[in-house]
Amino acid sequence: MKRLNLILLYIFCLLPLAAQRPPKHEVRAAWVTAVYGLDWPRTRATTPEGIRKQQAELIEILDKLKAANFNTVLFQTRTRGDVLYKSAIEPYNSILTGKVGGNPGYDPLAFAVAECHKRGMECHAWMVTIPLGNRKHVAALGKESVTKRKPAICVPYKREYFLNPGHPQTKEYLMSLVREVVERYNVDGVHFDYLRYPEHALRFSDSYTYKKYGNGRDLAQWRRDNITEIVRYLYKGVKALKPWVKVSTCPVGKYRDTSRYP
């Protein structure tokens, strides 16, 4: 009996230690931001030397992240209606060459994936989803902008443009971009950003699609359902292509801030 009691006591003493063990696979991730060149790049890839410098700048960032014990890089792959990989759907972001659609002479996403993997880090394609940029940005994209190619799924709001989450073709358009990335690149994950309506969007111009697809739901619930459906559709689409690719999203970080969104 004493022996049994000692065994039980030993087990109970170990339980708190087991509860405090870190997860087997801890994610230590950092964003590498390309929009406005906030993190990268500083140099334009317009010459062979420019290409080498631009690549070296990214390598320097990855080396620092590796030294700081990060194991996951969220590499900005789509910004606002433009991209940082060779796409048949949207143009290259001008930050690479100084020109909208300008070919940088290499594939930034392929390069980022290869360099991350050399350092034992995962590379996730970070894709901004719903926002398409302000009027100036959209005008600069010209006929390459999705607002010109697929105006039915785009909505102007407060001097900016957005994909309309309530239009059924929006999730299909986003999936076409995701499909390019997942099928053609050895990414370890896809990370969705701004997968939500814009702030204070009570007057967001989606009344037509609401009347057509609302099916009796109140506006707020319908909008929530739209976002849920897009997330579900993209998640299932990724898993159907490559089940091992991780899917994540960047939601609003503070609960008290959620009132700003419909």
Describe every region a protein language model picked out.
Residues 1-20:
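Bacterial Sec-dependent N-terminal signal peptides
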Residues 22-30, 70-81, 107-154, 191-193, ...:
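Glycine-rich, aromatic-flanked loop segments that form ligand/cofactor-binding clefts
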Residues 25, 33-56, 114, 125-184:
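Active-site-adjacent "subsite" loops/lids of carbohydrate-active enzymes
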Residues 35-38, 79-83, 129-133, 196-198, ...:
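Solvent-exposed loop/turn segments at secondary-structure junctions
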Residues 47-68, 95-119, 225-233:
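Aromatic- and glycine-enriched glycan-recognition loops and surfaces
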Residues 53-82, 184-187:
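Catalytic domains of carbohydrate-active enzymes, especially glycoside hydrolases
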Residues 68-104:
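Aromatic-lined carbohydrate-binding/catalytic grooves of carbohydrate-active enzymes
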